[in-house]
């Protein structure tokens, strides 16, 4: 029987971000995105003989299928920590882009690399921002998905990234006209719960890779979310999901709100900023997306009143109160139609305000190329060039964390999880010039004699075997230089 204590208030989590990529040149050689991506990763390949590596902050950096650089955060166990490491990925990716520009300039190829933290390119291809949450093995994933699905489908209302939807004239099945959508990802999922990730993207992926004790835990892989730019949007996306997971684990009385058609509903919600479209539930009743979110929010507010404070690390009740405050303000804004209380915190609201302003000033239609440019450049991660960056630097977008904390996360792994141990190994290996083989759980030194450590507990930041492995590398440092 579930109790309040059954909820994981300290939970391992992470975010994987795929970046869109293009190269804008002058009158020199035109380079394809895949060529630019390889140029970005060239120094990594030259050093490590691979484009798929773990880096000293404990995170994973790799070149995904096609031309999408991807960054997966190290294991984090509290909300602000996760935001710091997610944003650190933007810094790391942009530094790689700058290095690529400088390398190309030496070959008389002038131009700028653009990395976009969005989810849809100009021809309708989608790439992801995936969330990972460690959950107990005791609850079957399909049962968990059934309880979680109504929240995830309607969550776009409170934290979507927003975009202008342009109908594809080549798609004969296209049924939606030109319009503003609150989510970028909603049109690109096709199932509720499935093991697929690309061919038939689900809302929740069931691939069983816990990267922990598989008898105790599983990894909930959510692939429906948008890539967010504003820190408060990330906080609300992840923080609200943490609260819902905790309520499900504690059997806190969250009602069943199963939708009759998940995929039709997610697309309809994306095109209704009022959240007022009636959705059919499996029990024969109807509710709006806003009403579903309000029900979940009311339960989350009551949950926080008795939520156990995490004992070691984890997301504190104080921080969860910040999440609830923003969640409540956002729901009130949707209900009233007055978004002035959240128009510096929620991406789709910020972007829609910008687009509406351009429309009014220039008497533009929604299909005007200038608006498509605004839509895209909001997601440019280059400081001082991207529209989001400019707005944030002017104080027009609120912060959840600080630049100092983000920059610290660029070089140093989280100190409360297994990532701390991985970071120590990688920093020692880098300093000593030791070739190591690393993944989420296994860490191996290949010579002079193979030595390996398996870190099965993602919650543990202390391990004597890691101390011994680093000592082994130090003792044999000379042999690596010969």
Swiss-Prot record:
What is known to happen upon mutating residue 358 to E? Reduces pupylation
Catalytic EC class: ligase
Look up the domain of life of the source: Bacteria
What this protein catalyses is: ATP + [prokaryotic ubiquitin-like protein]-L-glutamate + [protein]-L-lysine = ADP + phosphate + N(6)-([prokaryotic ubiquitin-like protein]-gamma-L-glutamyl)-[protein]-L-lysine
Per the UniProt entry, the effect of residue 354 to E is: Highly reduces pupylation
Outcome, altering residue 64 to N: Abolishes pupylation
Spell out the molecular function terms from Gene Ontology.
ATP binding; ligase activity, forming carbon-nitrogen bonds; magnesium ion binding; ubiquitin-like protein transferase activity
Q: What does the entry list as the binding residues for Mg(2+)?
A: 16, 62, 70
Q: Which Pfam families match?
A: Pup_ligase
User: What is the recorded phenotype of mutating residue 201 to A?
Assistant: Highly reduces pupylation
Q: Catalytic residues?
A: 64 (proton acceptor)
The UniProt record's further free-text remark is: The reaction mechanism probably proceeds via the activation of Pup by phosphorylation of its C-terminal glutamate, which is then subject to nucleophilic attack by the substrate lysine, resulting in an isopeptide bond and the release of phosphate as a good leaving group.
Q: Which PANTHER family match?
A: PUP DEAMIDASE/DEPUPYLASE, PUP--PROTEIN LIGASE
The annotated subunit structure for this chain is: Interacts with the C-terminal half of the prokaryotic ubiquitin-like protein Pup.
Family from the record: Belongs to the Pup ligase/Pup deamidase family. Pup-conjugating enzyme subfamily.
Q: What is this protein called?
A: Pup--protein ligase
